[in-house]
Amino acid sequence: MVKIGVNGFGRIGRLVTRAAFTCDKVQIVAINDPFIDLNYMVYMFKYDSTHGRFHGTVKAENGKLVINGQAITIFQERDPANIKWGDAGAEYVVESTGVFTTTEKASAHLKGGAKRVVISAPSADAPMFVMGVNHEKYDNSLKVVSNASCTTNCLAPLAKVIHDNYGMVEGLMTTVHAITATQKTVDGPSGKLWRDGRGAAQNIIPASTGAAKAVGKVIPELNGKLTGMAFRVPTPNVSVVDLTCRLQKPAKYDDIKKVMKAASEGPLKGILGYTEDQVVSSDFNGDSRSSIFDAAAGIALNDNFVKLVSWYDNEFGYSNRVVDLLVHMASKE
């Protein structure tokens, strides 16, 4: 049983906790959040506007958060170095505040007794792992790793299957992305990224994303061959990747469909999905897979130039991969 601590009880922290309660290989033993007191944690975990009520029991008891009868130690430290993970029995920490995303900053958790840290965001310098793509390259000399971003987790399996079968010359990605907490409800100041400060519910907002370039880090052969951008759109959850790429080896679109379907039923089962249905974004709310290839939405200009479409629940799919990565890391101890 992998004993886990969660730092930051926001969208991802709460959903990693939900995902952990569907997995019998992990156990959440501690949660740290200086901004949310225990009773508020109970409320925030129980009710969720996007994913619905938690199907189970949640209560506060003797200063602990008790989920499905399991007591979880609560810390309220601002400085990660002060969190006594070791005392709570947490060996692995999910760093999901969005603040401590470098190796140096995330390493602070090790001072409190944690053995390893998974950053639930892209990192400037921590090694990035995408389940189903490069997780086999993990070795236990690494103390701090990143689970990359939700978009990289959607794009990388798609890019891997295409590159392994046909060779990718180059590609451009667009993610049509649901609203996230960093956006504004109405127009407001936003540092250097002026567009990002515009009202999230009122606009389609062009934005930058490092997700495509990050694929080059997890699939080295694609380094420098992919870049991309995002459009933030007024939906609460579920995003979609549009990958337009040139293939080295010509392929009929029907053959690409067959290859994607085979991958989704084989080595990438549970990570890559496949559908030929006439789906829309809300059909994937609560989907635990990283990337669901939409066979009916893609198009080919010719045998070497194609547009591929893949859906993802940017909250829940990603949170499940964080749990999967923790389980994989523990298997290498």
UniProtKB/Swiss-Prot annotation:
PROSITE patterns linked: GAPDH
InterPro entries documented for this protein: GlycerAld/Erythrose_P_DH, GlycerAld_3-P_DH_AS, GlycerAld_3-P_DH_cat, GlycerAld_3-P_DH_NAD(P)-bd, Glyceraldehyde-3-P_DH_1, NAD(P)-bd_dom_sf
Active site: C150 (nucleophile)
Keyword list, A-Z: Apoptosis, Cytoplasm, Cytoskeleton, Glycolysis, NAD, Nucleus, Oxidoreductase, S-nitrosylation, Transferase
CDD domains registered for this protein in UniProt: GAPDH_I_C, GAPDH_I_N
PTM info: S-nitrosylation of Cys-150 leads to translocation to the nucleus.
Residue sites binding D-glyceraldehyde 3-phosphate per the record: S149, C150, T151, T180, T209, G210, R232
GO cellular component term, pick one: microtubule cytoskeleton
Highest taxon of source: Eukaryota
Catalyzed chemical reaction(s): D-glyceraldehyde 3-phosphate + phosphate + NAD(+) = (2R)-3-phospho-glyceroyl phosphate + NADH + H(+); S-nitroso-L-cysteinyl-[GAPDH] + L-cysteinyl-[protein] = L-cysteinyl-[GAPDH] + S-nitroso-L-cysteinyl-[protein]
Signal peptide start and end residues: none
Localization of this protein: Cytoplasm, Cytosol; Cytoplasm, Cytoskeleton; Nucleus
Single GO molecular function: NADP binding
UniProt KW Transferase keyword: yes
Modified residues (S-nitrosocysteine): C150
EC number from the UniProt entry: 1.2.1.12, 2.6.99.-
Residue(s) at site: Activates thiol group during catalysis: H177
Assembly behavior: Homotetramer.
Protein name: Glyceraldehyde-3-phosphate dehydrogenase
Originating species: Pelodiscus sinensis
